[in-house]
A protein has these predicted regions:
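Polytopic endomembrane small-metabolite transporters, centered on the Drug/Metabolite Transporter
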Residues: 1-316
Length: 316
């Protein structure tokens, strides 16, 4: 009886998804991604800084292991339609996986030396890079004047906000800037793989996890993270274990929702959602984890997002 009800539930969800029109699907996916991503930076900050557990390669390795194990269990139980991993699929998706690995690691490093509001400000440069890549790599039409100006003003807001950061850390800002380039690259490649090769989100997520797991594990051992973790007192700290487990689980779900948003909507839309999310993140960041000292430029920069983002929504 339980299996029958579960099957009927999955069938109902699949039927609902098939009947939803293009704009309806896009709205659902965008909302899901927004919901998943809103808390991730705070979880990262809690684990990396508050608990002094700054081992980004180990953290990403754990997320990839959980993703691979869960998806393979679902595949074996035939709960999802998913082909087994193959070397050919891995090689085909390797450029995207390398960009993903670079972005994930650099983001965690940047967060360790940068407060959350300023990290969000730097990430607002991603739509500009996505806009350029959509023309160069995806061969899309040149953006309209309204769209181009919207993205340009958002990027300018990020630069203005950075001028008000009294705790400027060149290394952290460099890592944040490089993570922007890497994120724009892998989102664009996910969109291209979905459009040209018709790969499902779950397939791309599965292959990506297999591809990046050896990278994260190897680098983690090279930089000596296992030995440092063995001497770390973080695991014994009150509340660390559930927060760390939540970070790993949320990271897996976030990656899935992000891949799905890039495939169903677009890479540019995905990065614009991240920008919208960063407004809330910036406000909350002033009051959490030490926040950042108030400066008019810190408010002026993020406020640039409102009108340009509304213009983008009207166009899509």
């Amino acid at each position: 009886m339980g299996g029958c009800c579960a099957g009927q539930g999955r069938g109902s969800m699949q039927l609902f998804w098939k009947k939803a029109d293009g704009s309806g699907k896009a709205a659902l996916v965008a909302g899901f991604y927004f919901t998943c991503s809103i808390s991730m930076n705070f979880l990262n900050k809690a684990v990396v800084s508050s608990y002094e557990f700054n081992y980004p390669f180990f953290i990403m390795s754990c997320q990839m292991v959980v993703t691979v194990v869960v998806l393979d269990i679902f595949r074996i139980l035939k709960l999802i339609k998913l082909p087994a991993y193959s070397l050919k699929d891995g090689v085909d998706f390797l450029p995207c996986s390398l960009s993903f690995a670079l972005h994930s690691t650099l983001s965690l490093i940047a967060l360790h030396g940068m407060n959350i509001p300023m990290y969000g400000a730097i990430k607002r440069c991603t739509p500009l890079v996505n806009l350029i890549l959509s023309v160069v790599l995806l061969k899309k039409a040149f953006p309209s004047v309204l769209l181009g100006s919207s993205v340009g003003v958002i990027t300018m807001g990020a630069l203005v906000a950075s001028l008000g950061d009294f705790q400027f850390d060149l290394h952290a800002y460099t890592m944040g800037g490089l993570s922007v380039l890497a994120q724009a690259a892998y989102l664009t490649l996910v969109q291209r793989t979905s459009e040209l090769h018709h790969r499902s989100t779950v397939e791309m997520l599965h292959v990506n996890s297999f591809n990046t797991l050896p990278i994260f594990l190897t680098v983690s051992m090279v930089v000596g993270e296992p030995a440092k973790i063995g001497m770390s007192l973080a695991a014994a700290a009150p509340g660390f274990t559930p927060v760390f487990a939540l970070l790993i689980f949320s990271g897996c779900v976030l990656t899935w929702s992000q891949f799905m948003c890039a495939a169903v909507c677009s890479a540019l839309t995905t990065s614009m959602i991240s920008v919208a999310k960063s407004v809330i993140q910036t406000v909350l960041g002033f009051f959490t984890f030490g926040g950042v000292k108030f400066h008019p430029l810190n408010i002026t920069g993020p406020s640039h997002i409102l009108n340009p983002h509304s213009s983008y929504i009207l166009q899509v």
